[in-house]
Amino acid sequence: MNTHIQISRHLDVDGTTTYYVIEKNKNSSSIVWNGTCKQAAYQVAYRNARKENTPLYDTLYKAQTDKNGVKHIIPVGNELLEVN
């Protein structure tokens, strides 16, 4: 896949969600922004996607409960948000 911007989330043990805006190339990736504000993450991602004329993807997640009753959030794919 060519250069693109991706938004992903990480749920900490204490319940805090951290959002990451990542610029990905064929062989490398770099974190452009990270923080706990969802709106700021999407604003940064849209701004960078438009500035660099690259597509923007959001990571889709699915909740699963294992045999011990622990809930896990698993990434299942990417959704294309904007093509420039």
Positions of PLM-derived features:
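Short N-terminal "domain-start" leader segments
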Residues: M1-Y42, K51-N53, D58-K62, D66-N84
